Amino acid sequence: QALINYLNISPEHHVVAYDDEGGAWAGRLLWNLHCLGFENTSLLNGGIHAWLGASLPTSSDQETVQPVEHLVQVQLEHKAQFQIGYEELRQQVENENIQLWDCRTEEEYTGLRLAARRGGHIPGARHFEWSTALNRQNHLKLHPLPRTQQRLEQLGFDLNQPVVAYCQSHHRSGLAYILGRLLGWNIRAYDGAWSEWGNRLDSPIATGEVPS
């Protein structure tokens, strides 16, 4: 709420977000805005790298924004369309009634690299690392969506069924969320992420499975 007030934006504004890493942080910001009822948003494909690569103008001036004098009404009634919490997710995992996208590294997915008390992944999750969707030879722009969709389907994802994306801290899954939206997928993010799931001793986990 404080950020929205400071930026002086309302749901009527078209918010364009970008970063310097291909879209993860920018995607996370857009996800937050969607949860708050701000859906008139765009991601700048490739971020600042693509902007500079196209020789577009830049400025070193720091923009000053006058905060609004009144609170913009934040809409939270649709938050459940974009976010899922631990208890709901765990119930669906135990019922094997959910499609999960783990967008961390393969080492994190298999449990070889620990970033929490426990390593591995949520049972049933399929692995597709977030950065795989980025073209490093083209200023970190997204690969063509049909290519990414084909790869996801090859891994067993069903884009006609809802999916939940997660990473370590809901940073990298910010881009996964945006990708899902661009593909017309019914996608939510588990913002508790592995930092919550993997640090709880009662969470079911799977380890040692190498993604195909």
How would you label these PLM feature ranges?
Residues 1-10, 88-155, 159, 199, ...:
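Positively charged, proline/Ser/Thr-rich regional signature most characteristic
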Residues 186-212:
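Cysteine-dependent PTP/DSP-like catalytic domain, specifically the C-terminal lobe
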Residues 39-40, 97-98, 161-163:
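Short active-site oxyanion
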Residues 16, 99-101, 164:
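Conserved beta-strand elements of the Class I
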Residues 1-87, 92, 113, 172-188, ...:
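Thiolate-centered catalytic microenvironments shared by cysteine-dependent enzyme domains
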Residues 40-42, 99, 124-126, 186-188, ...:
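Conserved beta-strand segments of alpha/beta enzyme cores
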Residues 56-60, 142, 204-206:
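Short, surface-exposed amphipathic charged segments that create phosphate/polyanion-binding patches used
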Residues 167:
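Short cysteine clusters
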